[in-house]
């Protein structure tokens, strides 16, 4: 762990340098490939890990090798993972989905911004130096139209986004021919419907049923389509965002790019400091993944941080502002009802959700029902006009394992199920947020309750943390719970970093959180039996058994750390071709011994086989040619 502490000025300068020198970068011995769809502009990016050949015999002077197939893997890095793409953060990413959005002819450009706050910010010349220069002219659904992926799916339409996703979810496994790599254990999927091959029609049907969502605001055309659902790969979200005391626009853009490099499927901008609007614009215009927000945070800023002063009008203006910038999903704490707040009084840790506590305080101050609940249909009308998905927030989630699975938590969950049905009336896509802090033996109930109460809408959880005793290691305590609930059916896992409960994460913390959660998500995919999930594991195991060290590094989720740990003990280049590692040494390496045993067994089998044939030959009289009936 680094002990170097940078000043705020140094941190900003470092982030600015990162942005200024940013270019498409591939992982070691990987290359970007594109798998095309039925139309020319559906080009699905993947990373292909190139592997070295296996030594199968021959002599020292004339060795014989067998080629190993390249392994394609899911890639969230967008253009940042393609060395052939010129990156310019000042201009933003190419608008990948714009032709698809325009071709549907159900949306129109706005003459002016719908949000009074946005108009005010745009009129402020003092913000020119902070503002993203290539502002997008926002679009909205035409009168009487709905532009959501759920609406299209219910009409039986397979959109380009759906075809893109089908190709992406199959992870290029059709390219793999090796039976060794294709071998996979059957999973235990707890009632999930995992097909052998994911088709565009399957994607459409899952979205139409509400079991999956495609977060894809029509004002975020830069995003690459992805899906969140129980019957697809488990996804991982990363949180970034500035605060009133730390972090800048440059640092948040850097964290965005960094997050997508290390596997974030979506990113939530939880900014609460100054320049929230400007920071979000920079993030959206440079994000290849969906962006989520918690609009109540910004609405609170607009009333100077006083929860009691929040109004529906201020919140509505914030929704319009963010929808027209391109936010793909909103976390809305509409299930924190006035009558549920007293249920938290006897909790050890009360209400730990920031959004939940804001709404609880507002309800108690005014002794009125949550205005997000009261105006929920209006929220849905806004979302359906831009295709903003709803992430129904768990404002009453447990903040300690003592409070897990209590009355307040599940009462709110049942209300979220009722709100899900309302959102679906407006063709608005919905996922449900979950805990939190839950011991291992109580995790599965969270999944079963959610499936039943919320009609199989996708579940999105923060961990859960399985113990409360490990500040500084909560990425690990929560990774355990994340792997379990992902196996049980959770669709997306919100990462936890080592700084959880302690401070705002920096770049290294973001990486640590993401790697931990990519492990959890992948472990869940293996346990569920997602088609093709085991290919990379098989390739790694084969490389490990054959002492192909470079391939082991390159197949790892974090090749750089794997290489660094190996080189701490065996830094010489010869260590990367050695048939042992530093753990056991050359004489006690189990895999080297296993290879020797295998070779010996094969030789013995040949020798025994020859002896058997010799005995049989003598038993037949030693004649070279036998009569037909004796043969």
Swiss-Prot record:
Pathway assigned in UniProt: Cofactor biosynthesis; thiamine diphosphate biosynthesis
Entry binding sites for Zn(2+): 437, 501
Gene3D superfamilies: 6.10.250.620, Radical SAM ThiC family, central domain (3.20.20.540)
Signal peptide bounds: none
Binding site for substrate: 239, 268, 297, 333, 353-355, 394-397, 433, 460
Record's cofactor remark: Binds 1 [4Fe-4S] cluster per subunit. The cluster is coordinated with 3 cysteines and an exchangeable S-adenosyl-L-methionine.
UniProt cross-references to InterPro entries, sorted A to Z: ThiC, ThiC-associated_dom, ThiC/Bza_core_dom, ThiC/BzaA/B
GO cellular component: cytosol
Cofactor requirements of the protein: [4Fe-4S] cluster
Catalysis performed (reactions): 5-amino-1-(5-phospho-beta-D-ribosyl)imidazole + S-adenosyl-L-methionine = 4-amino-2-methyl-5-(phosphooxymethyl)pyrimidine + CO + 5'-deoxyadenosine + formate + L-methionine + 3 H(+)
Keywords: 4Fe-4S, Iron, Iron-sulfur, Lyase, Metal-binding, S-adenosyl-L-methionine, Thiamine biosynthesis, Zinc
Ligand binding ([4Fe-4S] cluster): 581, 584, 589
GO biological process: thiamine biosynthetic process; thiamine diphosphate biosynthetic process
NCBIfam families from the UniProt entry: PRK09284.1, PRK13352.1, thiC
Function: Catalyzes the synthesis of the hydroxymethylpyrimidine phosphate (HMP-P) moiety of thiamine from aminoimidazole ribotide (AIR) in a radical S-adenosyl-L-methionine (SAM)-dependent reaction.
Quaternary structure annotation from Swiss-Prot or TrEMBL: Homodimer.
Name used for this protein in its record: Phosphomethylpyrimidine synthase
Organism whose genome encodes this protein: Salmonella typhi
């Amino acid at each position: 762990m680094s002990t170097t502490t940078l000043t705020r000025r140094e941190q900003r300068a470092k982030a600015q340098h990162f942005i200024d020198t940013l270019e498409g970068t591939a992982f070691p011995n990987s290359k970007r490939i594109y798998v095309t769809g039925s139309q020319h502009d559906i080009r699905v990016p993947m990373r292909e890990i190139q592997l070295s050949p296996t030594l199968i015999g021959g002599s020292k002077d004339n060795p014989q090798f067998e080629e190993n197939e390249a392994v394609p893997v899911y890639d969230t890095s967008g253009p940042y993972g393609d060395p052939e793409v010129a990156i310019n953060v000042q201009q933003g990413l190419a608008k990948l989905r714009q032709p698809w959005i325009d071709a549907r002819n159900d949306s129109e450009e706005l003459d002016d911004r719908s949000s009074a706050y946005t108009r005010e910010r745009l009129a402020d010349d003092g913000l020119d130096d902070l503002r993203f220069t290539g502002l997008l002219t926002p679009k909205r659904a035409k009168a009487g139209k709905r532009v959501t992926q759920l609406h299209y799916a219910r009409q039986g339409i397979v959109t380009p986004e759906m075809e893109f996703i089908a190709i992406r979810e199959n992870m290029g496994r059709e390219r793999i021919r090796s039976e060794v790599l294709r071998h996979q254990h059957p999973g235990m999927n707890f009632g999930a419907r995992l097909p052998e091959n994911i088709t565009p029609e399957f994607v459409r049907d899952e979205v139409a049923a509400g079991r999956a969502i495609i977060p894809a605001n029509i004002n975020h055309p830069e995003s690459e389509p992805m899906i969140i659902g129980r019957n697809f790969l488990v996804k991982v979200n990363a949180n970034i965002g500035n605060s009133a005391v730390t972090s800048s626009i440059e640092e948040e853009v850097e964290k965005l790019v960094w997050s997508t490099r290390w596997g974030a499927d979506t990113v939530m901008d939880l900014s609460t400091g100054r320049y929230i609007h400007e920071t979000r614009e920079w993030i959206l215009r440079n994000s290849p993944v969906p962006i989520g927000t918690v609009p109540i945070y910004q609405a609170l800023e607009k009333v100077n941080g006083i929860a009691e002063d929040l109004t529906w009008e201020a919140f509505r203006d914030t929704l319009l502002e963010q929808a027209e910038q391109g936010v793909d999903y909103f976390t809305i704490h509409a299930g924190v009802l006035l009558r549920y707040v007293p249920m938290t009084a006897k909790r050890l840790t009360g209400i730990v959700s920031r959004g939940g506590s804001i709404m609880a305080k507002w309800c108690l101050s005014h002794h009125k029902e949550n205005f997000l609940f009261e105006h929920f249909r209006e929220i849905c009308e806004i979302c359906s006009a831009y295709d903003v998905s709803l992430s129904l927030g768990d404002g009453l989630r447990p903040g300690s394992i003592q409070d897990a699975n209590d009355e307040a938590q599940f009462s709110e969950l049942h209300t979220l199920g009722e709100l899900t049905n309302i959102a679906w009336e407006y063709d608005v896509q919905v996922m449900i947020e979950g805990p939190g802090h839950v011991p291992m033996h109580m995790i599965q109930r969270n999944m079963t309750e959610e499936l039943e109460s919320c009609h199989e809408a996708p579940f999105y959880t923060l961990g859960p943390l399985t113990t409360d005793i490990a500040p500084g290691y909560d990425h690990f305590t929560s990774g355990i719970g994340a792997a379990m609930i992902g196996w049980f059916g959770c669709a997306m896992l919100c990462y936890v970093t080592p700084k959880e409960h302690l401070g705002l994460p920096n770049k290294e913390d973001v990486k640590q959180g993401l790697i931990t959660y990519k492990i959890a998500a992948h472990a869940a995919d293996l346990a569920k039996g997602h088609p093709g999930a085991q290919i990379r594991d098989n390739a790694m195991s084969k490389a490990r058994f054959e002492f192909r060290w470079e391939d082991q590094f390159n197949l790892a989720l974090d090749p750089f750390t794997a290489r660094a740990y190996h080189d701490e003990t065996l830094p010489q280049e010869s260590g990367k071709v050695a048939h042992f590692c530093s753990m056991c040494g050359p004489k006690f390496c189990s895999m080297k011994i296993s290879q020797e045993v295998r070779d010996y067994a094969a030789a013995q089998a040949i020798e025994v086989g020859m002896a058997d044939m010799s005995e049989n030959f003598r038993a037949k009289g030693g004649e070279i040619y036998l009569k037909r009936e004796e043969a």
